[in-house]
């Protein structure tokens, strides 16, 4: 087995608030290998964006990474150890924030953010922002950096980049602004790009163009991607493997085809049943009952059990970590005790009501709302 390009183990990021501690990312692990696209999927509030920000060390106060290990090409970027008084602290082998900023962020690991208007400075031209980024990260003189910037804009299919170089962000359409962010991400030819829902604000036609562009660039440069999204159609189109998150934890991890064809976790199944699928014909879609709980006070046991149609009493007691439950040689991890791999006597445990069952008599869903 080859060493992963990126390895994240037991990552924990939390936010201290007046109401208590929000465990936004609570012990997730995943790998990314050379040249592959890995999906990070889940509803809003699952912790996807916080996970990406943690890898990039962009978590803002009052947020803090409090545990886990992140390795890149086998080198430890971040790890923790126990201090003399029992406190958890960064280990000496972790890169300092300055080292990470100078060596890793932008050069080896880049990002594409969701909203270009928040990521681009409105008072500076597109070209000046891209040129400055290249000057800093590739250590090029201004003229050479400008030439590289123009060529990079050309690579992401911005027409006449020499003429658009001195235009401001508001003079570009949403799709074109997203292309500028992609240009900024690939300008230093990084090995890994973390894309945080980069097509969410775009219409379907422009989204398709952006996905095709990313696919072409990946083929040209061999870049790996972590693609954060709630859109399962995008996942099916571009991802090699998928990680499904729920309330700060991993619910399921599998090859993309295996995930869609042989789903192992009730949450993933619920996600798939709530969206149209071209490979299946259904009379109506089934929404996921209830809402995701707050991470400040998660349910006991499995965090999905209050909404799960398969929940039993044991699900209130056991919070399972993802485990291989595959029926084949292909690894397929799921955090659900209904599988024999967990050996908790699920079959003989008493079924419990999900939120949908409990409030079903009062819940009316019209055909137009499905």
Predicted regions and their residues:
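The feature captures the beta-strand-to-loop junction immediately N-terminal to the Walker
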Residues: 41-44
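Conserved ABC transporter NBD signature motif
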Residues: 65-87
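Conserved ABC ATPase "signature" region
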Residues: 76, 143-163, 272
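Conserved signature/switch motifs of ABC ATPase nucleotide-binding domains
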Residues: 106, 170, 188, 212, ...
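ABC ATPase C-loop
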Residues: 180, 186-187
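P-loop NTP-binding/switch modules centered on Walker-like glycine-rich loops
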Residues: 198, 202-283
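Charged, flexible cofactor/metal-binding loops and thiol motifs
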Residues: 256-370
